[in-house]
Amino acid sequence: MKKLFGLLFLLPFIGTAQDCKLIRETDPFTKETKISTGFIFVNGGSLTIDADKKEVVVLFSINNTGRCFDNNSTAIIIFDGLKSKTSARNGGTMNCEGLFQFVFKNSASTTTILQRLMTYKIASIVFTDSNKKESTLTVAPADQDVILKLATCLINESKTLL
């Protein structure tokens, strides 16, 4: 009887674990595992979250080609249900392909921005490029749920790579 209650208690966790559809790749040379959400398409561009044992990278691809981003470019994330905005700088290299990155060290503790990605839905993100021009990614409610679920799965799974 106790075992039955134990199994019933674990059932919700097993059900949600099966919803994580992450892409898992192993580098043939280094034998290191990398996990990814794959690209999630939103209004104005797309995003993907990747992780290996060293870092977690959130990569945004903005549709407006010709947008140049450097280390002084910024992004302001507006979360649903949160009054304050989150601001971050580009962690990637200078490019004019419309690519913007947040780069975080993969560690046992989760940084504030990653924690917010796991707990709040993204309403929109405003990117300011190297020419001080703004581009906005707007996230539809259905996409908000997908991003929240995949971000939570990937960030939790990234801890197993350490």
Where are these regions (language model features)?
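An ectodomain-focused feature that recognizes extracytoplasmic/extracellular
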Residues: 18-71
